Amino acid sequence: MRIKNKKPYYLKRKTVIVDNEGGKYPGYLEEPIQIKANIAPASGKLQAEIYGERLNYILNMLYDENEVMTEGDGICVYVPKESKPDYKIISIKRYSHLVIELEKLLWV
């Protein structure tokens, strides 16, 4: 992957947040981790068949560095690193680099 095509983004790990009443709900850690990746809109016949109308909310991320990511982690794509992530990882495919599919979080 060409270095000049990579841009900085911020990864926020998923976690379980416990409120003061003992309720548990999913959330993201506050400390962002900077990564460099290439992100582009999803396209193609296969992804159109898989996601249908959700395709407008899907991005493809190409990543070839060492930071470990899991499905459900958040990525700050169009928001600053201090805010909640606007995309989450829904699929990780391992080739010579990682092809990661991101889906827009609509609660942002």
Regions found by a protein language model. Name each.
Residues 25-108:
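Short, conserved turn/kink motifs that form compact alpha/beta structural patches or helix kinks used as
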Residues 1-40:
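Extended boundary segments
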